[in-house]
Amino acid sequence: MRINPTTSGPEVSTLEEKNLGRIAQIIGPVLDVAFPPGKMPNIYNALVVKGRDTVGQQINVTCEVQQLLGNNRVRAVAMSATDGLTRGMEVIDTRAPLSVPVGGATLGRIFNVLGEPVDNLGPVDTRTTSPIHRSAPAFIQLDTKLSIFETGIKVVDLLAPYRRGGKIGLFGGAGVGKTVLIMELINNIAKAHGGVSVFGGVGERTREGNDLYMEMKESGVINEQNIAESKVALVYGQMNEPPGARMRVGLTALTMAEYFRDVNEQDVLLFIDNIFRFVQAGSEVSALLGRMPSAVGYQPTLSTEMGSLQERITSTKEGSITSIQAVYVPADDLTDPAPATTFAHLDATTVLSRGLAAKGIYPAVDPLDSTSTMLQPRIVGEEHYETAQRVKQTLQRYKELQDIIAILGLDELSEEDRLTVARARKIERFLSQPFFVAEVFTGSPGKYVGLAETIRGFQLILSGELDGLPEQAFYLVGNIDEATAKAMNLEVESKLKK
């Protein structure tokens, strides 16, 4: 067993034991603190500043030691606003890293980076806590068996299936549907698998965090009547927080997920929205700490910081953490160092396309750009693999023909190519799907489609059995039977109009 959760927080009891320092300098969220000789705190130790500001308001700021400067000074990054702090204020070294509550007490609750509840539902049981900094599991503890994680979303399960205990990246620019896709996955997984999820909101909009919380209460993922029956713990460090909080909130969420995996021996889902904001916060902190920037202005420690987070997300003999991470792609440039570094850690990538979103095809998952290491015949089986490859070939041929169609029109294509285009357009529309969490916007009830149903549907389109049906019948439906029923309805409607 790897985790040794402590049974109380890093509180210091008597005055004699306290290691006290004083603030020597404040630059935004970065504090320099002077300690007595021989009493220097360790790197990553939590420091607490308590006192009153100039107007008598209570101040309680937690910081994390980042650098030992020499001359008995340390440089620390604040986890909350430094408003009201002054030079000379007393600082307490807790002699331990930040520790957060873990276990069943966290379910159904919203926490900040320090593990404090922020949902006005009273205190949380903090008898079991874990430090947020920990090494990754040893090789001998890792579990290497391969199995598919069914999501109920057609395009994902068929073309870029997720690995149980793997890491999945959701790539896309602003406004193409990353957060909606994450909400749908949380919903489907809670209902279909009954698993526990931990959601880490890293540097995203407060409104989205609130919407997600309300959505979860409505869908029953969070049980208001009996909080302990809830299926998710939420940890937020949103856009308005200082960079220190945004940089560490991912580790807080991961620590809670690790406890469910290692101690409760459960399969856990860890959602991080957005991993780019973790890198962005690290970049801000790096500049404030005086490090020389690297490529495109990012921190020189980018790969190390990313690795220390990602390597802890894995399957062990006790349980698994399957992680789904939204990755904002700055200016839709996949070669930017932040998304490029993230790619190296992923088992599957789900790339969202602005072109598909513009066509109104949701989820706007690009079927040709999205990849998965799981799409191999020995893992998914021959039937699934063959169907996925034929779907990709058809869509790729359609993509190649689009320039010819734009210049010369469909009539100039050969009979075979025209058939390919017709089927590709049906496939493109059949890859769309109504979501449970988007019912409010679309008015269509959400659909969960099993993998076997998904494969059957695409096989029927590819075989030519459904060539007579109109394209519109395949748009925003669940399984293939719904598409044929929709085609009949469309036919009836068109007859009535005549």
From Swiss-Prot:
What the entry lists under NCBIfam families is as follows:
atpD
Q: Keyword set for this entry?
A: ATP synthesis, ATP-binding, CF(1), Chloroplast, Hydrogen ion transport, Ion transport, Membrane, Nucleotide-binding, Plastid, Thylakoid, Translocase, Transport
- Where is the organism placed in the taxonomic lineage, from the top? Eukaryota, Viridiplantae, Streptophyta, Embryophyta, Tracheophyta
Q: Which domain of life is it from?
A: Eukaryota
Name the Pfam families on file.
Answer: ATP-synt_ab (PF00006), ATP-synt_ab_N (PF02874), ATP-synt_VA_C (PF22919)
**Record family assignment:** Belongs to the ATPase alpha/beta chains family.
Q: Where does ATP bind?
A: 172-179
SUPFAM superfamilies associated with the record: C-terminal domain of alpha and beta subunits of F1 ATP synthase, N-terminal domain of alpha and beta subunits of F1 ATP synthase, P-loop containing nucleoside triphosphate hydrolases
Q: What is its EC number?
A: 7.1.2.2
Q: Spell out the protein name for this chain.
A: ATP synthase subunit beta, chloroplastic
**Subcellular localization:** Plastid, Chloroplast thylakoid membrane
Q: Which GO terms describe its cellular component?
A: chloroplast thylakoid membrane; mitochondrion; proton-transporting ATP synthase complex
